[in-house]
From Swiss-Prot:
Record PTM: Transiently phosphorylated on a His residue during the reaction cycle. Phosphorylation strongly increases the affinity for substrates and increases the rate of nicotinate D-ribonucleotide production. Dephosphorylation regenerates the low-affinity form of the enzyme, leading to product release.
Any one GO molecular function term: nicotinate phosphoribosyltransferase activity
EC number(s) reported in the record: 6.3.4.21
Name listed for the protein in its UniProt record: Nicotinate phosphoribosyltransferase 2
Organism: Arabidopsis thaliana (Mouse-ear cress)
Cofactor: binding comment: Activity is highest with Mn(2+).
Gene3D superfamilies membership: Aldolase class I, nicotinate phosphoribosyltransferase
Length: 557
């Protein structure tokens, strides 16, 4: 694609392609191409259409969702182009299609498409359009499946991450450890990115760290510990001090000396007797490799009788040479109990052996954690500083999909509606504007949709907000602040300014700030208060006029 199409003539930065090279125009459902052909055959392919991308219900039994995936959608738009090879394949899939349709596909791009969206990382709610896509119906129809694919999982896993952050609390570190359990390579990469967006602090996924600049965290597994048989396997025993001024020629012996001191300590001697020496060898070896970031997995054999004492011996030896060990990881057992016992042990070492700060060692917990287990740990009382969460986080174990939809709401300036016996599936017609209204305490009160040409809500002026389908649900609101939600992120080749795609860190900061600004009763895990989504009185009347106009009238005989 030429730079003037991808970046505009305003000198805006050229937009790279999607992170995953599999995201091409062929990442589509077949019926998008059959409809494109039918539109083209009927001469309707250039008719101006408006589609809304939205969801109908918040995930995980909650009352909020985090919007994610917008950046990847814009990258897809900016680089939308079918190759000759792809066009040949589409032709094979549509037997009997005319050759001229291939010429049409060959000329397709998104230079006549406009996309308005809520900023990525925003807290969003059902029915309100996350994205409004305008353009020739033949092109926009080919954006539906890719956009839904890019937004559905991204928003789901970002919301899952935000919920884990909420239950863990602001003070805890959250580490995403899900690569090995994710649904394939893209599931792993996407989950790492959007878990970070949703409030996690770091990932173990090296590829995601490289691609997105996410902080990396990780130490060692049980395999490393059990691979050692004794300290005799440690060949290089030399440790240079942190300041570089001294050298310990036999760090192994220094560790063993500290272990004996711990064993003979009056307050600690009753907890353990002999520790596992192969584990001690593994810890010592790892500390020699990473003296500045030593953190040990202590549950390979026995946490309190071996893992913790062995860790302390190595950490105390490192301390003598100017290094501060980071802490431990617990991957099994009663995490609440073991974390408390470990903390007590560390505090006793600090007190008995006069080592300032030793009691503040970081305790990391893993082992199939999820919202429920973290909530249970909180209720039991624990001393965990960081949670490593994998399977339940990245797979969104408690809900498989978000359920975003992409619905036509206007074509050739004519509003359209999708009806259903299930009222939750009735679409809200016409090209709309969306606003968030804030109350006196600074919290959002309601999101309201209006017709495109309606005057916007004004601060201090009373406004009637109506439920889109339930006539008895209505309320007056006097907003103290009004925020328009949809902003332009793509104007095709038009020489007009558009929103700049912010870096991931800024999107993450936005997400955290928005979540903090929500009313607490909307955020709680159990029985959260639903957030109000409404339409203006004028739009309400129009929805029901169009509904009656389009619904067939039955006849009784």
């Amino acid at each position: 694609m030429e730079p003037k199409e991808n970046g505009s003539e305003l000198g805006q930065k050229i937009i790279d392609g999607p992170t995953n090279p599999m995201v091409t125009p062929l990442l589509n459902d077949l019926y998008q191409f059959t409809m494109a052909y039918a539109y083209w055959k009927a001469g309707k392919h250039n008719e101006r259409s408006v589609f809304d991308l939205y969801f109908r219900k918040n995930p995980f039994g909650g009352e909020y969702t985090v919007f994610a995936g917008l950046e990847e959608c814009v990258k897809f738009l900016a680089n939308f182009k079918l190759t000759d090879e792809e066009i040949d394949f589409v032709q094979e899939c549509l037997p009997g299609s005319e050759e001229a349709f291939c010429d049409y596909l060959r000329g397709l791009d998104c230079s006549d498409v406009e996309v308005y969206a809520i900023p990525e990382g925003s807290v969003v709610f059902p029915k309100v359009p996350l994205m409004r896509v305008e353009g020739p119906v033949g092109v926009v129809q080919l954006l539906e499946t890719p956009f839904l694919n890019l937004v559905n999982f991204a928003s789901l896993v970002a919301t899952n991450a935000a919920r884990h952050r909420f239950v863990a609390g602001k003070s805890k570190s959250l580490l995403e450890f899900g690569a090995r359990r994710a649904q394939g390579p893209d599931g792993a990469i996407s989950a790492s990115k959007y878990c970070y967006l949703g409030g996690f602090d770091a990932t173990s996924n090296v590829a995601a760290g490289k691609l997105f600049g996410i902080p990396l965290r990780g130490t060692h597994s049980h395999a490393y510990v059990s691979s050692f048989m004794s300290t005799d396997e440690i060949v290089d025993k030399v440790l240079r001090s942190a300041d570089g001024k001294t050298t310990c020629e036999d760090f192994v012996s220094h560790v063993q000396t500290w272990l004996k001191k711990i064993q003979y300590s009056p307050s600690l001697s009753g907890i353990f007797s002999e520790t596992n020496q192969s584990e001690l060898a593994a810890f010592t070896s790892y500390a020699l490799a990473f003296p500045k970031t030593f953190l040990a997995l202590v549950d390979t054999y026995d946490v309190m009788k071996s893992g913790i004492p062995n860790f302390c011996a190595v950490a105390l030896a490192l301390n003598d040479f100017g290094y501060k060990a980071l802490g431990i990881r617990l991957d099994s057992g009663d995490l609440a109990y073991l974390s408390r016992e470990a903390r007590n042990f560390f505090c006793t070492v600090e007190r008995e052996l006069k080592v300032p700060g030793f009691g503040k060692m970081v305790v990391t917990a893993s082992n199939d954690l999820n919202e429920e287990t973290i909530d249970a740990l909180n209720k039991q009382g624990h001393e965990v500083d960081a949670f490593g969460i994998g399977t339940y986080l990245v797979t969104c174990y408690s809900q498989a999909a978000l359920g975003c939809v992409f619905k036509l709401v206007e074509i050739n300036n004519q509003p359209r509606i999708k009806l259903s016996e299930d009222v939750t599936k009735v679409s809200i017609p016409c090209k709309k504007r969306s606003y968030r209204l804030y109350g006196k305490e600074g919290y959002p009160l309601v999101d309201i949709m209006t017709g495109e040409n309606e005057p916007p809500p004004k601060v201090g002026e009373r406004l009637l907000c109506r439920h889109p389908f339930n006539e008895s649900k209505r309320a007056y609101v006097v907003p103290q602040r009004v925020e328009e939600l949809l902003k332009c992120y793509w104007r095709g080749s038009a020489d007009e300014a558009r929103e700049v795609l912010p870096p991931l860190k800024e999107i993450r900061d936005r997400c955290i700030k928005q979540l903090e600004n929500m009313r607490p009763d909307h955020m709680r895990r159990l029985n959260p208060t639903p957030y109000k989504v409404s339409v203006s009185a004028k739009l309400y009347d129009f929805i029901h006029f169009l509904w009656l106009n389009e619904a067939p009238v039955g006849e009784l005989q």
